[in-house]
Amino acid sequence: AGSGFTLNANNTATAQVTGIYKITYSLQFANNDNAIHNAIVWLRVDGSSATSLNDVPNSTTIFTLQARKSALLPNFVCGYSEVVFTLNAGESVGLWWGTDQAATSGGATGIYMYALAAQTSPMAYPATPSALGSITFVSALPS
């Protein structure tokens, strides 16, 4: 891939070049519960096998979602963060998240990642993805 990464079936990306990288992400969370909950997001990397990922120290960001506004209107948060990290060629990185109260859209109450198809009414706008992100090469490792 021309981007310097190969996307993997397990939602990780494998670096083609050793270096220092910056991941930037935006995650759309919803809370349909009557209580405040946290969404906790962090990076995991591996040593060339995407089957055993290790947590990246100091990569965690906590997003607090207030209680829902009403039974039909969840509380939304667009969580944004940037993390600088090191990868060797052949290593993979993935973005992970967890919460104290997981839910599904239209299912149990709690936190879930929110996506919305393109809309035409009452006004037209494109789809709202649950996650956006990019990985940027910052520099080679110091010699």
Show which residues each predicted segment covers:
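Extracellular jelly-roll beta-sandwich "head" domains, especially the C-terminal globular C1q domain
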Residues: 1-143
